[in-house]
Amino acid sequence: MTNLTELQNLVDRFHANIDFYKDARNAYNEHSCRIEYIDPLLKLLGWDVANEKGLAPQYREVIAENYSTRTDRPDYTITLRGVPKFFVEAKKPAVDITRDADPAIQTRKYGWNAKHRLAVLTNFEYLAIYDTCHIAHEDDGCAVARYRLYHYTEYVEKIDEIVGLIARDTVYSGDFDAYLDANFPATGGQTQQVDTLFLSQINEWRVALSNELYAQGGRYASLEVLNDVVQEFINQIVFLRICEDKNLPLYHKLKDTITDADQLQPKLEELFRSADRRYNSGMFSGEDIIFDLSCEVIKGMIEDLYYPQSPYLFNIIEPNLLGKICEIFLTEQLVLLENNTIGLGKKKDCQNRSVVTTPTEIVKYMVDKTLSKVCEGKTPSEILNISVADIA
């Protein structure tokens, strides 16, 4: 039950100082707004913002980004036992989120890339809830895909409605997912899910790369060889792009390799060798196909991973989504079409079944129940010696 007296006091305090907060000449920033208003609002909605329950990091209800550090992630990740359910993006009151479209586009991009169906944007003066089933476009206005908009003077009056959308009890009871299923359909209409779109993009590269190599003959006349080398090259490019968005160290950015067409292939090979030395994962240790591909096809592939061609934020896309994409990717293989070009076809053992991934919530529960006690008190080296069987 939300404490209406506390909520009214919060609203009254904001109202008494709103002119100061909204004056851009004053030094009232997002940091202060989060501490004084947005954190308390989330707490009144039941969320343990400060982790007063002392939960382990992987099970925190709210993951808040550092107040004083500007990151490329949403300010709050709201979770169900550690599984992200929606984001909250915060702005200072001087930012008019009802007129300035940039915060809305940013919020929608965050939600879409995480495959969430709603996201919250607030400067406390307003609380906006966005439908994030749709790709955000740079020319969208701030009202596009906006599902609800509340002024702070409405918070007390409409608290039941707000609670029914984003409160902790709503999420933990299952009502949140039921509401989304009824009101935020993930398919149909103009919706395009991030995993479906990215898989389609990968398959386009797969076919383009394969046809270019197949035309050269030799070892590339083998579909088995093509399957392996093309998959490996795509993995390498996507891995490097993910490293960039996650701010992991690289010799230089992937995009830097395409600034000079004459140097593209040597620069990319140099980047691959550098990544192999740094990460020692074996991903870059094999024979690469860089010099067997045209600069045009490589450049097009890399450009597809950057703005403005790309809608993807790889620091937001969850690993489980990438895993799902990989699983579906592996259900198809290269096939030789009647016109002697390469296309894609379902593998025989996948033709009559679909890929169903285990929901993250269930994975976390299973791991907690089966491995937590086994790993308790062990050193990292001891944990590495544990054998785990996945019966499925």
Residue ranges and their predicted role:
Residues 123:
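Short, small/polar-rich loop/turn modules that mediate ligand/substrate recognition or access, typified
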